[in-house]
Structures are given as C-alpha cells and as structure tokens.
C-alpha cells in the first residue's frame, strides 16, 4: 500500500520471466489475474524483463499501486505510456476493490460488466461483487452492450463509485497512515465477503488508525 513492491509481486514477476525463458512462446503473450492476481499481472507488465514482448495485460478487478511503485514504473520505463496502452481493466460494475490505491490503467481501457449477485433463491449476495462468478453468465463475461449489441465501456454501479470516493480521500492521508487505513479497509471488504487477504493482515493498530484518522477524513 505504501511500499515499492511486495514479495508476492516479485514472485509473480520472477515466475513469469522463468516460464518465458525456460519454455519460450509462440504467437501472442498475455498476463492476467483476478484481484491480487490482477495487481500482480499489472506489476509483471511494468517490471518483467520481457515486458516489451507482452501483447496485453488483463487485470480483472485488480488493485492499483503505491505512489512509490508508480514513480518507479515511470523511472524504469521510458515507454511507460505505451505500456499503459496495452493494459486493460475488467470489473464487475459493483466491484469496490479495483479503485483502491493508485490506479494506473487508463480510463479508456477500463470496462464495467454486468454483476450477477443473486443466489439461486433470488436474494442478493454481495459476496459476488468481487468474485469472478459475479461477472460470468454461462461460460462468458456478461459485457454491457449498446442497442446494436456492441461491447461498451459500461457504467459503474454505486458501490464502485463509493469505493472511488473513499480511495480519493484515502490518498490525502499522510504516507505513514495511508497504508494502515488501506489494509484495514481491504481486509474489512474481504471479511464481509467471507474471504481473507492473500498476503497481508490488518492489525489492531491499523484498525485504530482507520477509526481515529481515516474514517473522519474519508467521510468529511
């Protein structure tokens, strides 16, 4: 949340580079992942030794990066803007997670798809708003389309918009408080969905910072 990189991001980059170098490839080369996997796919796109060979990155509901990480990406990539042009964000229109931290994927490459968060009995189940099952209808992504059937960028729902507002205010916090609030918010979201953070844990001190400093600023 404030670090330049995480162990999981570095592991993803090392694994990708190893596979490409060990086995090679023919045709197009893609990186993709969901949630933290989407974040790691973006990281690979920015840091891999083979990033110039990657056709595209598809981040599905993946988070963004700290200011320090983004500064590093720009410093290490003279073709930073060109790389961004090959990165795409695909999200449930209700997903709250992809708006967290510093978003780098351009708005013109961001798509919102229809969310299906009803149980078999028809009751709303919000655990699906950040779950690949929530954006799949049958065996395909349920894209938002225009009246002619063409895929559109879509319209984000209220929960996604709220997450964007929260994140914008979160970015106003001092650097040493920003990480604590971000991790507490993300773990709260995951716990509400019945899951857990992939490689991070919020401590009592993080929740204290969120309660004392973060929430008053976010709701101001």
Give a label for each model feature:
Residues 41-49:
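Short glycine-enriched nucleophile-adjacent loop
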Residues 32-37, 41:
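Gly/Ala-rich beta-loop-alpha elbow adjacent to hydrolase catalytic centers
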Residues 1-28, 48-220:
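Alpha/beta hydrolase fold serine-hydrolase catalytic domain that processes acyl esters and thioesters
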